[in-house]
Regions:
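Residues lining the SAM
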Residues: 110-115, 140
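Conserved catalytic/acceptor-binding region of the Class I
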Residues: 138-210, 231
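A short acidic, Gly/Pro-enriched loop at the edge of an enzyme's catalytic core
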Residues: 99-108
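Class I SAM-dependent methyltransferase SAM/SAH-binding core
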Residues: 47, 51-99
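Conserved alpha-helix/loop element of class I SAM-dependent methyltransferases that forms part
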Residues: 25-45, 59
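A short glycine-rich, Lys/Arg-flanked "PGG" loop and its adjoining helix->strand segment in the class I
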Residues: 121-136
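Conserved Class I S-adenosyl-L-methionine
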Residues: 179-184, 197-264
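Class I SAM-dependent methyltransferase Rossmann-like catalytic core
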Residues: 3-28
Length: 264
């Protein structure tokens, strides 16, 4: 298995665009609040790791302005072409295997990335090494084991099916080397990496139209793998997608834990 094989959800499939749109709706307000908190402004140099779609990169580009720089990296940059112009530089890069794409960054940020990277220890070291002294690291990652249910209010057969399929999704992720308890470890890992003033918080939506869109796109994207692994039948998946489409189920997400610290 190569490091990039660790990622289950291919960015080139149509559903990836739907998923990135849902992440933006669900998590951008939280991410932008944290980025503002750690400090991003004109002239800053930022590395956006595992950028995926364009919303965070575009926001960072507006904050740093023409005098700044945003290096946006991903193992698959196919969704980033629209923002690949100064101050944004887009590079294909595996954060678990490649050298950092520069050094002396004021800010390094990754959202919902390291949980998927088999060598996340190396990835974290690389991100810290790319900071200037005084630079800020912000890592936001899921902790699906902390809140494993897509339907926390499991009150009927629709919700039970949804939670069973979610369990299958988690198994596929874990089999690919994802650490499903990663989010909670971030404060300790940041301190162990030598960062100062480490703090963290968590956020998850309990229901939202974007959760519905995310669930539909995710299940359509992994349906073949769920069936091949014997974790669900095509009938299960059709029934679940129809339930999701019908509305009325309160679909949540795993908590996203945001942790930040300063390089001494
Ligand atoms: C769940 S998506 C999150 C995308 C984006 N950060 C967001 O929050 O909307 C995970 C992203 O990490 C990327 N990724 C997975 N493994 C990676 C690795 N080893 N190095 C760099 N990027 C990786 C994927 O290609 C994908 O774009």
């Amino acid at each position: 298995m190569t490091p990039s094989d660790g990622y289950l959800l291919n960015n080139r499939q149509d559903e990836a665009g739907e998923r990135f749109g849902a992440f933006a709706s669900l998590f951008d307000p939280v991410t932008f609040r944290h980025l503002e908190g750690v400090g991003v402004g004109p002239g800053r140099r930022c590395w956006e790791v595992g950028a995926g779609g364009t919303s965070v990169v575009s926001w960072l580009a507006r904050q740093v302005g023409p005098a700044g720089q945003v290096v946006a990296t991903d193992i698959d940059t196919s969704r980033l072409a629209a923002v690949a112009r100064p101050p944004v530089e887009v590079r294909v890069h595996d954060v678990g295997a490649d050298e950092p794409p520069g050094d002396g960054f004021d800010l390094v940020h990754a959202r919902l990335v390291l949980v998927h990277v088999p060598d996340r220890e190396r990835a974290l070291r690389s991100m810290v090494s790319a900071l200037r002294p005084g630079g800020m690291l912000l890592i936001e990652d899921a902790d699906p084991a902390l809140q494993p249910l897509i339907c926390p209010d499991e009150h009927g057969p629709e919700q039970r099916l949804a939670n069973r399929l979610r369990q299958g999704f988690r198994k596929l992720l874990a089999d690919r080397g994802a650490d499903l308890s990663y989010g909670r470890k971030l404060p300790r890992l940041l301190r162990e990496a030598g960062l100062h003033d480490v703090a963290a918080d968590a956020y998850f939506p309990v229901t939202s139209p974007a959760c519905t869109a995310l669930e539909s796109a995710t299940v359509r994207q992994i349906r073949g793998r769920l069936v091949a692994a014997g974790l669900a039948t095509d009938e299960d998946i059709d029934r679940h997608l129809a339930n999701v489409e019908a509305g009325g189920m309160d679909l949540a997400t795993a908590p996203m834990i945001s942790a930040w610290g300063r390089k001494g």
